[in-house]
Amino acid sequence: TKWKNKGHVKFNAYAGFNFDFLLTSHTLFSNLYSFPWLFSTNACQMDTLPLARNMEYYNPNILKTDINKKNHKIFKLASLCAMNGFPIKDSHTAKDDTLGLKNLTEYLKKNDSELFNKNLQFINKKDVLPYVKNLKYFYTTETFFSKTRQFACCFLTEHSFYAGYILAFDLKHDPKDIFEGKSNQELSKLLFATPVKMRTIKSNRLPLILKPEEKWVQSIQDEYSAIGKDELEKRA
């Protein structure tokens, strides 16, 4: 009742989409408690880890990061807080980690409020599908092997099993080379062979969706900028 009466509440965590929110949901469910973020009060979830990764990717000067032995940037909460001037007093304790998360989130918002708010554009997961379906093509981000990168994609379809999952075609590949004159067996083999031809957008995990003309996309020189906007539009 306390959270329900508050109305529009953002439940924030660090790596929450991969751990905290899942653990909390399972714990609440197993003990027959209600889900405070599932009430129809515009409550929602956000996660500062992917937000920090996205913001550092498009604005590399916004965060100082430590480097590990593999020469990868470290995005652990305690490390980011220490590197940027607000160290966590007692790391891995509930109170101090919460204060660290608060400080980091406020730091990101203060230093680039425009990009910060852009990352929160789809905090309501129901807004993602109609938005991407109405775009010729768009850019989204993914992080794997400790590196964040952008992908130019066009909408393909909704996932047949996982609600809220959107399948998008990666436009670094020419669809003519994949779809023309192929049997179903050949097509299936090509689509699921590496490199991956499709990207999965999870609507409930606060995806960043950018239009091709937005300044953040324009600031990145990559394989898509080499292909060029005209060719990407043809492929879409």
Residue ranges of each PLM-predicted region?
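Conserved non-catalytic scaffold segment of RNase H-like nuclease domains
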Residues: 1-30, 74, 82-83, 181-236
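Poly-acidic low-complexity segments
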Residues: 44-47, 93, 170, 174, ...
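Polar helix-capping/helix-linker motif
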Residues: 110-112, 121, 125, 230-236
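Sequence-level detector for tyrosine residue identity
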Residues: 14, 33, 57-58, 107, ...
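Metal-dependent phosphoesterase core characteristic of DEDDh/y 3'-5' exonuclease domains
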Residues: 3-114, 119-122
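A broadly tuned preference for mixed-charge, low-complexity surface segments
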Residues: 62-80, 139-164, 214-230
